[in-house]
């Protein structure tokens, strides 16, 4: 009978209810039915499936019937907890019975492919052009700059609209520019021009030739010059030309307008296509939007009024100044009857104006260049006296210099204790009392305390004193600059080096990647700007070396998006940083390197050591080896210090593959250097540390007498260390 009853019930859900009723009598628990979770279907789906429609109507009756049939049994003790039933139903709902969510998750690339909104009164061609650039050509991150209100207009033309887009590669950049020009010619009958675009086969041929030259240079053992040769510029500017402009609001034409020709009515559209790296480097949006805000007619009139008032005030002050500087005794008359207040003459001395503290550093436009002999015209009457401090530099007294030198020789903790509690502390320690006494005894130069204060704060900042800040150092430099004395180049470089120094590590020993803050870099750049106006060459190798080091991290780092192999211990010796911060440092490095190449900055051995360490710590191995090989091309000898640094960096990094390549390639090259680099005790220690990274069992293999490259090199270094200890003993 049960078989006949089940055969009559065609719905699977109804069969489940019947079986559930029999199992409940036997006190057997059964998972909650799946159809209890409400499931909605569209109207079209209900009409398309008769069986599902019939099942839904029959299921409702069976549900009510089964519920009523189970009520008496549930009262007898077979009741289930409602929370457990709902929890089981949530766990056992299959994917084909789940409700479809109305909210569709956004695509990760959707924001990059969005089309910017149209400006007010757009040209008729603009909407179709944006659609074609985004959909058909495939440029990402489109931005639109409406420059039609610029006054004066940009050099590209009046009523300019600029579209900026990012190409996915250099090949995509050339293909996109070529297709856009062809589309404009065929569809809109325009004559666009594309600056930087190469032909379809020209780019392929030039890239093939460049790859061939690079391969030949690599086989010959020389470095390939990767300067910009015009092939891979990463930037193409497509000038669409003059198109019909949108209908603008009627404006009154200026009555006093003077000029030739008619006012331009059409709009100029320019499409800037760049690669992602080139767009981040140029930052066209920031250049056009931030530094040059649009000026309306009212703003221009207000500016003209302010300028006229400023000009009248300047003329009045100049007239008062001429009257005040005239000779009160009068001037002998001449037959010509000239106004001697306007007479010109020749100066034989230099007049140094009084300079305020803020104008000395933040606005030093009127500071004379050091060492410049200016021949000016003497005024009628007594010549103004020249301050004696402007003719010679300010030097420290021997007692003050000796105290500062002693501070650098004592241990760091003792030096910090002797410096007291800050710049305002003058008598809390014996050193500060002796320092103030030495300043008071310097009677021959009462302004010596200005330079002494600067040097004291500089030493404190270099020692990482907690109560001496870099702002105090900058204020001391401003006071020294306002005093009128000449600032030597060594004093300025020491100040910049202290401002660009890294902060001390945390006392709790937390591993964080330290960087110089942007505010400290701004202070250092202000000092360099002031010194450039005084005649100092700030494009020197020392300045670039300090800026290059301050732009990065203090310790070895790696981006968090990289997944090194678990067998390598490189993860233990490098600190993970965010990919955005890592890319920012790389971008600053590239810009500094391009500036150095443009000005042909020649580095010395000390700067090369700093650059090599910097690039290796930041994982820029290609640039590290490019600088290493460039030294031989510049005929700079790679001395013992360079090879000690090379092997120590690979040993500290802990990468087995790189350590093995370094040992096999550069240990034999030490004997070929001019002059040759011998393996002494210092070199032997770093080579043995590098050997332990490349082969952790090299010591046991060498003790067992195994033949091989690494055991023999280990024995050689061990013998050098034994001989060195015997010589010292």
From Swiss-Prot:
Chief place where the protein resides: mitochondrion
Region (Disordered): 50-90, 100-119, 320-343
Membrane topology label: Peripheral membrane protein
Pfam family, one: RsfS
Subcellular location: Mitochondrion inner membrane
Domain of life according to the entry: Eukaryota
UniProt keyword annotations, A-Z: Membrane, Mitochondrion, Mitochondrion inner membrane, Transit peptide
Keyword Transit peptide: yes
Transit peptide feature, positions: 1-60
Compositional bias ranges of the Polar residues kind: 59-70
GO cellular component: mitochondrial inner membrane
InterPro entries recorded: Atp25, NT_sf
Entry similarity comment: Belongs to the ATP25 family.
Function: Probable mitochondrial mRNA stabilization factor.
Protein name, UniProt field: ATPase synthesis protein 25, mitochondrial
Provenance organism: Uncinocarpus reesii (strain UAMH 1704)
Lineage: Eukaryota, Fungi, Dikarya, Ascomycota, Pezizomycotina
């Amino acid at each position: 009978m049960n078989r006949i009853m089940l055969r009559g019930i065609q719905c699977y859900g109804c069969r489940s209810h019947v079986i559930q009723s029999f199992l409940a009598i036997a006190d057997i628990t059964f998972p909650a039915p799946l159809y209890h979770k409400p499931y909605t279907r569209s109207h079209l789906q209900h009409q398309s499936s008769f069986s599902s429609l019939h099942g839904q109507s029959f299921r409702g009756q069976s549900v009510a019937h089964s519920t009523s049939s189970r009520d008496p049994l549930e009262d007898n003790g077979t009741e289930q907890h409602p929370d457990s039933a709902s929890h089981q139903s949530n766990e056992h709902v299959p994917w084909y019975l789940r409700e479809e969510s109305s909210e569709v998750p956004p695509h990760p690339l959707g924001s990059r492919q969005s089309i910017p909104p149209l400006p007010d009164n757009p040209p008729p061609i603009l909407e179709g052009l944006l659609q074609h650039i985004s959909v058909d050509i495939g440029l990402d991150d489109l931005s639109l700059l409406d420059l039609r209100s610029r006054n004066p207009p940009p050099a590209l033309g009046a009523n300019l609209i600029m579209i900026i887009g990012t190409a996915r590669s250099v090949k995509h950049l050339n293909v996109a520019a070529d297709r856009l020009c062809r589309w404009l010619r065929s569809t809109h009958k325009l004559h666009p021009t594309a600056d930087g675009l190469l032909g379809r086969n020209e780019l392929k041929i030039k890239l093939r030739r460049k790859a061939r030259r690079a391969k030949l240079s690599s086989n010959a053992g020389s470095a390939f010059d990767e300067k910009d040769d015009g092939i891979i510029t990463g930037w193409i500017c497509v000038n669409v030309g003059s198109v019909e402009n949108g209908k603008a609001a009627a404006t009154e034409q200026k009555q006093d307008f003077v000029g030739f020709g008619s006012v331009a009515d059409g709009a100029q559209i320019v499409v800037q296509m760049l690669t992602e790296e080139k767009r981040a480097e140029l930052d066209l949006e920031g250049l056009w939007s931030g530094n040059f805000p649009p000026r309306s007619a009212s703003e221009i009139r207000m500016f003209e009024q302010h300028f006229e008032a400023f000009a009248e005030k300047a003329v009045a002050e100049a007239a008062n100044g001429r009257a005040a500087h005239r000779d009160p005794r009068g001037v002998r008359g001449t037959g010509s009857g000239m106004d001697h207040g306007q007479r010109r003459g020749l100066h034989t001395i230099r007049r140094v104006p009084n300079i305020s503290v803020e104008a000395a550093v933040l606005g030093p436009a009127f500071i004379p260049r050091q060492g410049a002999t200016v021949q000016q015209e003497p005024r009628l009457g007594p010549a103004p006296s020249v301050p004696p401090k402007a003719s010679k530099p300010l030097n420290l007294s021997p007692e003050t210099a000796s105290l500062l030198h002693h501070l650098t020789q004592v241990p760091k903790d003792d030096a910090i204790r002797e410096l007291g509690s800050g710049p305002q502390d003058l008598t809390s320690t014996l050193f500060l009392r002796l320092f103030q006494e030495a300043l008071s005894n310097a009677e021959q130069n009462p302004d010596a305390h200005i330079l002494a204060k600067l040097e004291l704060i500089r030493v404190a900042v270099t020692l990482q004193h907690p109560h001496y800040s870099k702002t105090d150092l900058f204020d001391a430099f401003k006071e020294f600059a306002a005093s009128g004395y000449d600032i030597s180049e060594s004093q300025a470089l020491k100040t910049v080096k202290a401002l660009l120094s890294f902060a001390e590590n945390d006392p709790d020993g937390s591993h964080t990647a330290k960087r110089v803050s942007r505010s400290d870099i701004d202070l250092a750049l202000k000092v360099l700007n002031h010194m450039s106006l005084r005649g100092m060459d700030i494009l020197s190798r020392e300045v670039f070396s300090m800026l290059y080091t301050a732009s990065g991290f203090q310790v070895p780092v790696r981006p968090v998006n990289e997944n090194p192999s678990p067998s390598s211990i490189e993860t233990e010796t490098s600190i993970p940083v965010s990919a955005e911060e890592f890319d920012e440092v790389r971008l600053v490095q590239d810009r500094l390197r391009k500036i150095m190449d443009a000005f042909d900055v020649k580095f010395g051995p000390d700067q090369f050591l700093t650059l090599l360490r910097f690039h290796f710590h930041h994982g820029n191995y290609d640039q590290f080896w490019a600088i290493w090989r460039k030294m031989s091309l510049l005929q700079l000898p790679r001395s013992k210090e360079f090879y000690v640094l090379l092997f120590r960096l690979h040993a500290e990094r802990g990468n087995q593959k790189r350590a093995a390549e370094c040992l096999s390639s550069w240990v034999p090259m030490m004997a070929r250097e001019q002059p040759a680099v011998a393996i002494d005790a210092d070199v032997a220690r770093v080579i043995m540390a590098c050997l332990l990274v490349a082969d952790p069992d090299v010591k046991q293999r060498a003790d067992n007498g195994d033949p091989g490259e690494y055991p023999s090199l280990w024995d050689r270094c061990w013998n050098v260390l034994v001989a060195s200890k015997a010589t010292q003993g």
